[in-house]
């Protein structure tokens, strides 16, 4: 009997494991749904029938709707939504339930005026727009966490629940310059520096007679677009970032306490220009079990920059997480027919598991009422509904092979302080990062965006593109990476300033000059130096020579490099004389390469191709230009022809199209803007 019980228990464990495994091998297609716009239960039932007919598996609900659940202080109204959740469960549609802690309700702004935004000129702003709350305000946080507690307790065990959404677009919204915010900033500075002397030293306040004698003399820096006081601005942006992260962690802790088995997800637009913050703190914590973004690739079918930009967004939100990624918002609007489908297949190659269209119903009111959804304003499905239905039908055929697990051998370094510091340079850090990412997009190769201080750096090749702020921890990890056999490529604007934002007074690249075997002098402005160009170049144009091959590029500036043991790999050859611009230095078991120009594909491409061979980095699938491709596992390949011409795929083996249920005996052709998923026989 005892043995029989053990067998039964073991069987249950195995079934649970297999169920979890099958759940992971799944793709979700669905929509963002706003039942609070019309609580008519018959309309909701009709919508759900249409969702079922389309093969939808998921809806995202609740975002931006705090006062639909708490219309006045402490008065919760979940009854209407309980019925919606029950209907979703009956239809076997899973729910991502956003905890809508922003925007805060008007009643909360009225009760606590301190939570309203104060602009940099001291004007208190009425919350006419969304995200108009000071998220660091203790009164705001008290009520946001109370709302989180109520909602998660109420729905933690609902069978329709797939995940709780943690805020929405946390990097968007205004920064508040209120007195309460200033006092919190002062407290943050006290905790960091402990003394006024340390603060004055870090901020170089002797410059322009700005010495601080007591804490209360501290004011805010100018608006975020100002170039004044870079040291102070860097600390202020760290403070803003810390407040956002602290709130997100508090919300996550409440969710995990009340609903320990629930997945967590956010639409992480951390790189909004308004409140750009350091999302790596969340990403590396592991507490956000499903990273996410809004995949808005634009309306075009024939251009691909939108797909590239949004796929890059996945990479810089996911960092090194191996969990599936969720695109919890996805284009509808006026996207050209088949462009949504193109984007959906492209997203699979970056680990995406979910295509959740924004939005289901074209909304009847508000600022977004002209953003067309899958249903027109009268509830009649339009062509976007049909396209999402097609995506759901096709994804069902291939889902057991997904989500794709990236196999990256290359890391691309991101640094939040460097993004803030780089506003003083012609090329911002994130633009250099994307230029490096683009290199691998064109080669159909996996990469990971990494935060060096948090990463184990288990890569063969590491790019450090314009990482301006160099601290002891980061420099030590780069040094160890190279010493132990790694190859690093660092581009201009890197290791310029220390962690306070002050330019290194020692030899640059700061803390790493010996590693690279160079001394960086000053920079030159290309446009003025072209007055003496041997080739009569004008503007920002430069000729770069790599291994005897002349390549045209452009750059606002270029570095003056003195060799201190490094060898020259490339030169600028169009100016008054040759200037060494790409160098290589052996260090330990590895190699450190410096490029005195911002990251550009034409400058780095040939070097990368050489390093792929030299370091035995696995190449992407061999496909014609204009085809995205990934080898999903040992005998399955995903393709997306993103061009307007048919593309022939070279194939020696026999294969079968799982998408279109046909056999190939060798090479096969993919039609323009069409996907293909094949199994090698």
Description of each model-found segment:
Residues 45-54, 58-124, 152, 251-258, ...:
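Aromatic-lined substrate-binding rim segments of carbohydrate-active enzymes
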Residues 29-40, 64-79, 126-145, 170-174, ...:
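The substrate-binding groove and active-site-proximal loops of carbohydrate-active enzymes
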Residues 9-19:
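Bacterial N-terminal signal peptides
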Residues 299-681:
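Carbohydrate-binding surfaces of carbohydrate-active enzymes
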Residues 125-290, 294-309:
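Polysaccharide-binding and catalytic clefts of secreted carbohydrate-active enzymes
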Residues 38-53, 144-150, 274-284, 310, ...:
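Short, acidic/polar
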Residues 31, 51, 59, 88, ...:
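Conserved, mostly hydrophobic/aromatic
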Residues 25-29, 55-57, 89-95, 157-162, ...:
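Short, well-ordered coil/turn segments that N-cap beta-strands
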């Amino acid at each position: 009997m005892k043995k029989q019980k053990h067998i039964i228990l073991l069987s249950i464990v195995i079934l649970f494991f297999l169920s979890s495994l099958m759940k992971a091998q799944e793709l979700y297609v669905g929509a963002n749904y706003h039942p609070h716009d019309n609580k008519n239960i018959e309309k909701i039932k009709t919508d759900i029938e249409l969702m079922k007919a389309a093969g939808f598996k998921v809806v995202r609900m609740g975002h931006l709707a705090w006062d639909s659940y708490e219309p006045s202080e402490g008065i919760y109204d979940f009854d209407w939504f309980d019925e919606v959740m029950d209907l979703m469960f009956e239809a076997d549609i899973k729910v991502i339930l956003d905890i809508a802690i922003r925007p805060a309700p008007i009643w909360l702004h009225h009760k606590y005026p301190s939570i309203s935004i104060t602009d940099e000129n001291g004007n208190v702003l009425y919350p006419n727009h969304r995200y108009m709350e000071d998220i660091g305000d203790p009164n705001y946080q008290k009520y946001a966490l109370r709302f989180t507690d109520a909602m998660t307790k109420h729905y933690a065990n609902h069978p329709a629940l797939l995940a709780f959404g943690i805020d929405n677009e946390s990097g968007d919204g205004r920064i508040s310059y209120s007195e309460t915010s200033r006092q919190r900033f002062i407290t943050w500075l006290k905790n960091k520096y402990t003394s006024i002397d340390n603060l004055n030293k870090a901020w170089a306040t002797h410059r322009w007679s700005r010495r601080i004698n007591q804490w209360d003399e501290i004011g805010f820096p100018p608006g975020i677009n100002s170039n004044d006081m870079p040291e102070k601005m860097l600390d202020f942006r760290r403070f803003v970032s810390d407040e956002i992260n602290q709130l997100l962690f508090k919300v996550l802790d409440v969710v995990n306490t009340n609903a320990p088995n629930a997945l967590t997800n956010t639409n992480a637009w951390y790189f909004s220009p308004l409140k750009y913050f350091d999302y790596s703190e969340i990403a590396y914590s592991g507490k956000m079990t499903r990273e996410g973004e809004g995949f808005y690739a634009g309306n075009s079918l024939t251009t691909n920059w939108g797909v590239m930009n949004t796929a890059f967004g996945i990479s810089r939100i996911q960092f090194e997480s191996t969990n599936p990624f969720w695109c919890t918002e996805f284009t509808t609007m006026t996207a050209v027919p088949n462009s949504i489908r193109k984007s959906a297949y492209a997203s699979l190659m970056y680990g995406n598991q979910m295509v959740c269209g924004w939005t289901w119903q074209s909304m009847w009111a508000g600022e977004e009422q002209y953003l067309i959804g899958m249903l027109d304003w009268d509830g009649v499905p339009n062509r976007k509904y049909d396209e999402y239905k097609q995506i759901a039908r096709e994804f069902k055929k291939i889902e057991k092979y997904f989500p794709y697990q990236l196999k990256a051998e290359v890391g691309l370094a991101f640094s939040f302080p460097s993004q803030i510091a780089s506003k003083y340079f012609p090329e911002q850090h994130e633009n250099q990062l994307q230029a490096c990412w683009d290199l691998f997009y064109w080669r159909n190769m996996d990469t990971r965006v990494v935060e060096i201080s948090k990463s184990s750096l288990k890569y063969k090749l590491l790019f450090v593109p314009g990482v301006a702020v160099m601290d002891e921890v980061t420099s030590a990890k780069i040094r160890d990476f190279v010493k132990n056999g790694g190859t690093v490529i660092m581009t201009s604007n890197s290791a310029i300033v220390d962690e306070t934002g002050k330019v290194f007074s020692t030899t640059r690249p700061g803390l790493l000059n010996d590693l690279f075997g160079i001394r960086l002098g000053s920079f030159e402005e290309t446009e003025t130096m072209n007055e003496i160009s041997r080739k009569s170049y004008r503007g920002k144009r430069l000729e770069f020579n790599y291994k005897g091959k002349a390549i045209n590029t452009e750059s606002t500036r270029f570095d003056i490099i003195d060799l201190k043991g490094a060898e020259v790999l490339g030169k600028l050859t169009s100016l008054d004389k040759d200037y060494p611009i790409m160098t290589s230095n052996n260090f330990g078991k590895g190699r450190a390469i410096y490029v005195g120009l911002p990251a550009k594909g034409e400058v780095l491409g040939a070097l990368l191709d050489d390093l792929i061979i030299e370091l035995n980095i696995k190449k992407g699938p061999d496909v014609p230009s204009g085809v995205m491709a990934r080898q999903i596992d040992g005998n399955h390949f995903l393709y997306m022809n993103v061009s307007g011409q048919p593309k022939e795929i070279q194939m020696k083996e026999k294969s079968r199209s799982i998408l279109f249920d046909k056999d190939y005996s060798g090479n096969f052709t993919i039609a323009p803007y069409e996907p293909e998923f094949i199994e090698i026989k």
